[in-house]
């Protein structure tokens, strides 16, 4: 569950970045930092980002950027809600 789905999220992110002519490599330090945190904290405590804070402005901007890919937009909404509910 954790690794298989995480890798799929990387693949989806790569598609989005490629569409905007941004190399996936810009994500590597963030991916590394996120993975490192679970060595030091329980995963729920290591969670950061707009979903855990329920930052509607950022979430809505992200959803707007995904407007042309409704399947990713729906996935983003569902995962964001799941992250927020874990608080």
Features from the language model and the residues they span:
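Active-site-proximal catalytic alpha-helix in oxidoreductases
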Residues: 1-18, 29-39, 43
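NAD(P)-dependent Rossmann-like dehydrogenase/reductase catalytic/cofactor-binding core
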Residues: 25-87
């Amino acid at each position: 569950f954790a690794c298989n789905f995480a890798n799929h999220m990387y693949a989806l992110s790569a598609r989005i970045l490629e569409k905007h002519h941004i190399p996936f490599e810009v994500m590597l330090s963030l991916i590394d930092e996120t993975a490192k945190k679970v060595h030091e904290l329980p995963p729920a405590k290591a969670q950061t980002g707009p979903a855990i804070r329920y930052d509607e402005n950022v979430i809505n901007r992200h959803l707007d950027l995904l407007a042309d890919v409704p399947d990713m937009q729906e996935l983003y909404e569902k995962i964001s809600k799941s992250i927020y509910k874990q608080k």
